Amino acid sequence: MTFESSSAYDIPQLQPTEFVPANLAAWNMPRHREYAAISGGALHFFLDDYRFETVWSSPERLFDRVKAVGASLTPDFSIWVDMPRAAQVWNVYRARWCGAFWQSQGIEVLPTACWSTPDTFDFCFDGIPDGGTVAISSMGIRSSKADQALFRAGIQELINRKQPQLLLAYGRLRYCDDIDLPEVREYPTFWDRRRKQVSDSWEDGAAKAVPDQGPEPATSAAQEPVELDLEA
């Protein structure tokens, strides 16, 4: 099955959408998917590639999982620095193909952008609609200045080439303080949610462990400071 493309690599062109998900649910988490299905959310693939390889290898068999939610980001197949160029192009092609297939079946689809070194810029943004919404994530960016610089360069190139009106960031969008960004909407990661759950649970437990002390007693007149006349 092939889809319309203006790319030199025949990477499928996605259609624009105004849909903005209320939340993002991981492809491999059933309860998160169930919540997304009833709350206007969308699937995301900011996971290890092996966890969602089957969206490409068995698209029809796994389509019901996408259909149950009704909206999805495109798969985030990795583009590693040390990958052969052919493999990098292949992963971009697969990601857009899945998105185009889902769109053909009535699913709301938002493109996920990823990149590697600047020599990937000639193809890694192919198929992303101009002036639309694009999903990204700075998760996994290592602390080295070189990695952070590559991430910033990709963000700037995405803006220059596609002029997105909205960026959907999985997790806090870091390393971009010096870039003139469009509107950004950040979504909590799985670990953000877990930390909040643990924190809320601890606070609830602490409140139950400490008995109610009642209202704070008023300060009596005897407890008020007395000014002494030292010159008497």
Where are these regions (language model features)?
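C-terminal accessory extensions appended to soluble enzyme cores
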Residues: M1-F19, L181-A232
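Eukaryote-skewed repeat-based solenoidal scaffolds used as protein-protein interaction platforms
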Residues: R31-Y35, S39, L43, E53-S201
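Basic, amphipathic N-terminal segments that precede the first structured/catalytic domain
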Residues: M1-F46
